């Protein structure tokens, strides 16, 4: 993991098209702004984990493909 230090209003750039800016620092909380292309999904980790759990549950409950012949 790369660890970077940034101050308020400083940023980092990922892959030339994703910019992360430190918007605010208040106590032990940091607010970040993310500029990314629309096709790049950006989620808080807890939201991402919930999406993954929902996708796994959907896949587990999805009917078998009718083209599958055993």
UniProtKB/Swiss-Prot annotation:
Its main location: cytoplasm. Keywords: Bacterial flagellum biogenesis, Cytoplasm, Repressor, RNA-binding, Translation regulation. GO terms for cellular component: cytosol. One of its GO terms (biological process) is regulation of carbohydrate metabolic process. One of its GO terms (molecular function) is mRNA 5'-UTR binding. The keyword Cytoplasm applies. It is found in: Cytoplasm. Belongs to the CsrA/RsmA family. HAMAP family: CsrA (MF_00167). This is Translational regulator CsrA. It comes from Rhodopirellula baltica (strain DSM 10527 / NCIMB 13988 / SH1).
